[in-house]
């Protein structure tokens, strides 16, 4: 039997719903099996005579019967051989029981190891599921952030290139005017409009002026 600490069998008893046999528990603890009461005496003599008087009274009868019937000696000779065969069978049976108990002990230890391995694997699976859920939530947040950024950039680009929207055109024009104001010496379209209006007004005023006439008249006769 393998030497080692006594395993705790309460977990297995709770899972199986049955109590571990006492003989198996004794085998696990390394104790010897309890002796059975009323075991047969291998010599075959003990228990046959209760007192010396009965044995002495039994001996003459046996001798007289043996002297009277000489042919009855063969069953008496076969009786010790039958006891020997029975003792041999009992010894073999006890040895097989010891081997079975040792096998049960090994199986019980293997079951305990398997139970611990299953518990550790279950714990690892639960931890992996927790890490996977956290990773999926983080990846989902990152994907949503990237999608929102790409959508906003695409919308801004489309609004800049969409000429059908008057508001966008005004906003783009005002933005360009603002940029032109920042550049020194650059004339904006509004400055050109003011320049053309002022030149037209000056030309019209020059046309409306009357020519200056001399006050002296010359008469030719």
UniProtKB/Swiss-Prot annotation:
Transmembrane annotation, as ranges: none
Compositionally biased residues, Basic and acidic residues: 8-21, 28-39
A family per Pfam: LURAP
Record's keyword annotation contains Acetylation: yes
InterPro entries named in the record: LURA1/LRA25 (IPR039499), LURAP1 (IPR037443)
Keyword flag Cytoplasm: no
Positions of the UniProt region annotated as Disordered: 1-81
PANTHER family: LEUCINE RICH ADAPTOR PROTEIN 1-LIKE (PTHR33767:SF1)
The name this protein goes by in its record: Leucine rich adaptor protein 1-like
Organism: Rattus norvegicus
Gene: Lurap1l
């Amino acid at each position: 039997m393998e030497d080692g600490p006594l395993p705790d069998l309460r977990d297995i008893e709770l899972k199986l719903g049955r109590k571990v046999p006492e003989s198996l528990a004794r085998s696990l603890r390394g104790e010897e099996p309890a002796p059975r009461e009323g075991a047969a005496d291998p010599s075959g003599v003990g228990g046959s005579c209760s007192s010396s008087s009965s044995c002495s009274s039994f001996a003459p009868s046996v001798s007289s019967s043996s002297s009277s019937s000489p042919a009855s000696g063969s069953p008496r000779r076969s009786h010790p051989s039958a006891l020997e065969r029975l003792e041999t069978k009992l010894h073999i049976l006890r040895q097989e029981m010891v081997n079975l108990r040792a096998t049960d002990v090994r199986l019980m230890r293997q079951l305990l190891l398997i139970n611990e391995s299953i518990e550790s694997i279950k714990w690892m699976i639960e931890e992996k599921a927790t890490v996977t859920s956290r990773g999926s939530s983080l990846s989902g947040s990152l994907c949503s952030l990237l999608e929102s950024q790409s959508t906003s950039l695409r919308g801004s680009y489309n609004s800049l290139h969409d000429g059908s929207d008057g508001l966008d055109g005004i906003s783009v024009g005002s933005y360009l005017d603002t940029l032109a104001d920042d550049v020194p010496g650059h004339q904006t379209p509004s400055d050109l409009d003011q320049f053309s209006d002022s030149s037209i007004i000056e030309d019209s005023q020059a046309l409306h002026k009357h020519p200056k006439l001399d006050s002296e008249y010359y008469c030719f006769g």
